[in-house]
Amino acid sequence: MIRIADGRKEENWSSINIIIDIFRSTTTIPVILSRGARYIVPFKDVTSALNFKRKNKNVVLIGEKYGIKPPFFDYDNSPAQIINADLEGKIIAFTSTNGMYVLSRIKRGRILFSSLVNMSATIKKVKGKDDILVVPSNRPIGKAVEDNIFAEMLKLALEGKNYDREILVNRIRETKENTVVSISTQDLEICLKLDLLDCVPEYIEGKIVNDP
């Protein structure tokens, strides 16, 4: 069975949980790993990420709080900033307002990260599996329309049902005007690139890693 449930409210987790945060963390995360990072250590808050950096000087800090890059961070939660960054062999400390909060709530099962940029890779990885939960991250003040549109796309694809990808991607593009936090044109274009990457990040034993 494939379900969709709000990551901020759900308590009934599945064998496979797929976190969705289109604008921007589940787009940025696969981009980070595609740039050669060893792994990502996720944090629910900025202070914890900074403390980790103090103990591990070579760590690269990436993330945002309410859409703004925190002081002392190396990069924003921005796929456009990361897409050409040299992260080869680096350990990343990452935090975001929505996606990492939802990650902290999931208590069982495998945890994957998906967006438009790795949609086909995600489908290939989990197609045919039972007990899948697609988890829109949404926002503290309510639903994120773009996350829920993509969640429906992913569910339909996994169920083998027909849908118009172009129409749905355009609907996601249109939601940009209604997002709480402004998104740069450069970030938006990367967030909307279907199948840009082949990797499906997975959270394993405190780290987000590329296809284990």
Curated annotation (Swiss-Prot):
<dbReference type="GO" id="GO:0000287">
    <property type="term" value="F:magnesium ion binding"/>
</dbReference>
<protein>
    <recommendedName>
        <fullName>Probable 2-phosphosulfolactate phosphatase</fullName>
        <ecNumber>3.1.3.71</ecNumber>
    </recommendedName>
</protein>
<keyword id="KW-0378">Hydrolase</keyword>
<comment type="similarity">
    <text>Belongs to the ComB family.</text>
</comment>
<dbReference type="GO" id="GO:0050532">
    <property type="term" value="F:2-phosphosulfolactate phosphatase activity"/>
</dbReference>
<dbReference type="GO" id="GO:0050545">
    <property type="term" value="F:sulfopyruvate decarboxylase activity"/>
</dbReference>
<dbReference type="Pfam" id="PF04029">
    <property type="entry name" value="2-ph_phosp"/>
</dbReference>
<keyword id="KW-0460">Magnesium</keyword>
<dbReference type="InterPro" id="IPR005238">
    <property type="entry name" value="ComB-like"/>
</dbReference>
<dbReference type="InterPro" id="IPR036702">
    <property type="entry name" value="ComB-like_sf"/>
</dbReference>
